[in-house]
């Protein structure tokens, strides 16, 4: 019990909150996104860095966000609602990857512009998680993304780099990557 004689939320309650995630919408353009008064957390990174898989792992749902071995499968902004049943307490945003993708250059350029606009203008964006393939380290494209969001990070946007694909390396490669 806390000072207000209400039960403290348990760790199980917190886990259940995250695991009631559901697909909300997909959008090819920013003006197609709903305006919601809840915090958004965006997942960004190169094509095939593991953004969709990360969302699925966090929510403990294997097929919430479509994950594929083919780079460039996520071609729109996908929003996932997180919250207790019937409510939206936060949004997880799966953005298209940048860099290598099996799509025409013009489509890649369009995705990159939409993603940059989303990161710079989305009012309820509270955090950005950049997934980085640990076998590659930070690439020139990752550095470009950092420059795009630097002003928002300086204004208080939370930012995290999440290294992925460590399971694909042997011990020596892992030590070198660190």
Locate the predicted segments by residue:
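Conserved C-terminal guanine-recognition region of P-loop GTPase G domains, centered on the G4
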Residues: 112-178
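Helical mechanochemical/support elements of P-loop NTPase systems and associated helical scaffolds
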Residues: 37, 63, 76, 88-91, ...
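A general boundary/transition motif marking the beginning of the first structured unit of a protein
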Residues: 11, 103, 169-173
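Hydrophobic, well-structured mid-protein blocks that either form specific transmembrane helices
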Residues: 82-136
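Basic side chains
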Residues: 46, 51, 69, 73, ...
